[in-house]
Amino acid sequence: MSKPFKLNSAFKPSGDQPDAIRRLEEGLEDGLAHQTLLGVTGSGKTFTIANVIADLQRPTMVLAPNKTLAAQLYGEMKEFFPENAVEYFVSYYDYYQPEAYVPSSDTFIEKDASINEHIEQMRLSATKALLERRDVVVVASVSAIYGLGDPDLYLKMMLHLTVGMLIDQRAILRRLAELQYTRNDQAFQRGTFRVRGEVIDIFPAESDDIALRVELFDEEVERLSLFDPLTGQVESTVPRYTIYPKTHYVTPRERILQAMEEIKDELADRRKVLLANNKLLEEQRLSQRTQFDLEMMNELGYCSGIENYSRFLSGRGPGEPPPTLFDYLPADGLLVVDESHVTIPQIGGMYRGDRARKETLVEYGFRLPSALDNRPLKFEEFEALAPQTIYVSATPGNYELEKSGDEVVDQVVRPTGLLDPIIEVRPVATQVDDLLSEIRQRAAINERVLVTTLTKRMAEDLTEYLEEHGERVRYLHSDIDTVERMEIIRDLRLGEFDVLVGINLLREGLDMPEVSLVAILDADKEGFLRSERSLIQTIGRAARNVNGKAILYGDKITPSMAKAIGETERRREKQQKYNEEHGITPQGLNKKVVDILALGQNIAKTKAKGKGKGRSTAKAGIVELDMTPKALQQKIHELEGQMMQHAQNLEFEEAAQIRDQLHQLRELFIAAS
């Protein structure tokens, strides 16, 4: 199943890239546990990492700080490795309200969640790829440090089918039920199976568009075929096939029975403690809730909130780390932490918030103390589990620099020859009027401006002032969700407006080549938003434009400003020297605007090729590219209904065309969510 990694790119490494690739590879081969790639904005850090992966041929996990960047990286890696398994592993919740108790108002909030089925399928596909092959790149968010089913139990539960094997039909159906597949002879969808005589059709939970047909003759498996679940057309026959569980949290029956005994023991101990402390209400509440869960587990094999008993189900001791995606990564795997100055602190903060909420639930009798072990990894556990690691950032944090020691690989020279922005410091007294004249100069030549302020009030006032003076301006604030933010950035690039005002416009990793000026108001006010790293990141937003410039408004130069200016000038000097030595003229980036939201479009086209006669690729039109994610989701549901209707009417060509369109819309939805 595994193939060697094959990098697909029209470009060869240039600038600082060849040296960075060589040094990173040497470090990994020498067994270094930690290295840092200090790559400036627009220097092709992802391309460098892709080259390292292709050269070393090692399964890799790429950690991104949020879903937006994870989607962007997923799209880029898909383009670099079209023939290999590039997978996407982020939280599958569209909406998630964890259970909680507020003692002050005696309010219990039930767990409520909405799961995105497409992302759930991609998560299952990611773990399957890690278990089956070595040419895997999994792009993950911090969701990777949260508890997942135990890989050993997951492997034990798999159903292996081979042509010629002797197995009773009822035994197959029973095993499918244990894997949490449901029988549905009417609507054939992901995670279901149907039975027609001696033929069993199974739609694997991790598959998007391929199902398995098991044909039996008496008690022998006569044939295994892969077919299109929509048209019924057989794609190929296979000698063997492995069916993976429908969820990561499946557990063998004997393990459940053993866990139930352990839960009963803990309940008895906890009841004694509560009664001894005269907590009668809490004791009654805990007994009632736990007994109900035990009955559900006995009858169905699972219960609502079964993750709270994960310690018993996976056979761990008190306080031991939960199994996570890291347990699925091979021992010689490679970890790449993108935008590490943001991602590393995030990993450190996850455990504490989760712990505080659960302690209240345990104290007031809503959960057993073992529920505290259903948690994300502690930071020291993450460190112990992480394989050889490359931290990637334009502004690495103290942790990465300390861990890497001298192994910091500089990637300052851009392949395009672009230089870091020129920096000017101007007085605060005239900052608004000065900014207005700078904006007018940029707007006249069709360039864009980013303005960052210190407070929400100032951002609002400045936006109002600029509007009164006839400027096309928008304000980006914390109430705007990720999706709308992406749309605002797209509109800025398209020229719908010229100026974007915000408080924290770092937005690591987002490409805006049209931005030629970054203005930082009150740059001399020391603090989080005006620290050295924040300033360098903000200045870097103008680094993708030939005329890139940053204006820092301040009456004095603070230590953070001095360091940021010094570092930018060091980089600029090195870039200029390289350009002069190699006769390079800086060239602006010409990146299509739809690239931001249509990351998966090419992937969908590739998937649609060569899958049976009569299939024609339905291209996602401009209408779809301009749709909001909410509208996209609505469109997807609408098309799914139409597709099923066509299939029921035996209009398979029309159904297949809609399915191809759905592929593209789902990719667009992932990119935008």
Swiss-Prot record:
Chief location of this protein within or outside the cell: cytoplasm
Ranges for domain UVR: 633-668
Record domain Helicase C-terminal: where: 431-597
One of the GO biological process terms: nucleotide-excision repair
Molecular function GO terms recorded: ATP binding; ATP hydrolysis activity; DNA binding; excinuclease ABC activity; helicase activity
InterPro entries on file: Helicase/UvrB_N, Helicase_ATP-bd, Helicase_C-like, P-loop_NTPase, UVR_dom, UVR_dom_sf, UvrB, UvrB_inter
Pfam families reported for this sequence: Helicase_C (PF00271), ResIII (PF04851), UVR (PF02151), UvrB (PF12344), UvrB_inter (PF17757)
Subcellular location(s) per record: Cytoplasm
GO cellular component, one term: excinuclease repair complex
Residues where ATP binds: 39-46
Keywords: ATP-binding, Cytoplasm, DNA damage, DNA excision, DNA repair, Excision nuclease, Helicase, Hydrolase, Nucleotide-binding, SOS response
Top-level taxonomic group: Bacteria
Sequence motif: Beta-hairpin, positions: 92-115
UniProt domain Helicase ATP-binding: residue ranges: 26-183
Keyword Hydrolase among UniProt keywords: yes
Job of this protein: The UvrABC repair system catalyzes the recognition and processing of DNA lesions. A damage recognition complex composed of 2 UvrA and 2 UvrB subunits scans DNA for abnormalities. Upon binding of the UvrA(2)B(2) complex to a putative damaged site, the DNA wraps around one UvrB monomer. DNA wrap is dependent on ATP binding by UvrB and probably causes local melting of the DNA helix, facilitating insertion of UvrB beta-hairpin between the DNA strands. Then UvrB probes one DNA strand for the presence of a lesion.
Entry domain remark: The beta-hairpin motif is involved in DNA binding.
Family: Belongs to the UvrB family.
Subunit structure as annotated in this protein's UniProt entry: Forms a heterotetramer with UvrA during the search for lesions. Interacts with UvrC in an incision complex.
UniProt protein name: UvrABC system protein B
Organism: Salmonella paratyphi A (strain AKU_12601)
Annotated gene: uvrB
